[in-house]
Amino acid sequence: GKTGLAGHSMGGTIAFRIAAQRPQDVAFVLSLAGAAIPGKDLMMHQCEKIILSQLPATTSDSLRTLYEELYGTMALPLPLDSTRHRSTPLMVSIWQHLGINEGTYRENLTDSIRRRKARQLTGQAISPEIASIIQYDPSHDLSRVQCPVWAVNGAKDLQVLPEENQKAIETLAKGSPQVVTHIYPGLNHLFTEAPTGHPSEYGLLKGNFSQEVLQDMAEWIRKTVGAPQTVF
């Protein structure tokens, strides 16, 4: 028989990809804040909400240009070493603007040591996983999904912006017989109640995954594929 797929964040994006590649095996997709826009745009929107919005306008304007160039570079279909090489000066400029890792730029360090430290930091920041996210455009896979889709976001999600993400799903998933989208007020990317939704709050929140979301998910599965209602 067919299998239903559920995924959170990039897991939701991967669920769409599997559903597109193996339509004969997938009964439905549950996307919990699964990204439906190109990775480069996703990262830039995260940057706007999580980093740039917290900074003075003069700083954020300069950084915005650097981040746009960085993500544009990382989106190019290049070997990872080439991507890291091209990205290093951009990341150094970003870190200098943010005052991060200032030890890398101390005057008493030689240029060769500074360059080596910058390469090390860039190598850590630009992993194969991050590069693959930025280079991936889910639109092709979404347009090939043939199963029912239930896609939800929290209204305070700053990592996968709810309105634009759900609009993309509704627009692209034309092959699906049923697309249900919903935005839950007060919930963050983790589907917990949150003051602002900023990731810096994650470790401080004491609530659990929303019971309302779980109940709605179970009800949708029951109505869509006739499965027994699950009690959470």
Write out the residue ranges for each language-model feature.
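Short alpha-helix in the alpha/beta-hydrolase fold that links the catalytic acid
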Residues: 147, 161-172
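Short beta-strand/loop motif that positions the catalytic acidic residue
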Residues: 145, 151-153
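Accessory cap/linker subdomain of secreted extracellular hydrolases
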Residues: 32-143
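Acidic catalytic loop of the alpha/beta-hydrolase fold
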Residues: 156-160, 189
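Short glycine-enriched nucleophile-adjacent loop
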Residues: 12-23
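Catalytic active-site module of serine/aspartate enzymes centered on a nucleophile-bearing elbow/loop
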Residues: 187-190, 196-232
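Catalytic histidine neighborhood in serine/cysteine hydrolases
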Residues: 173-196
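Alpha/beta-hydrolase fold nucleophile elbow
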Residues: 1-9
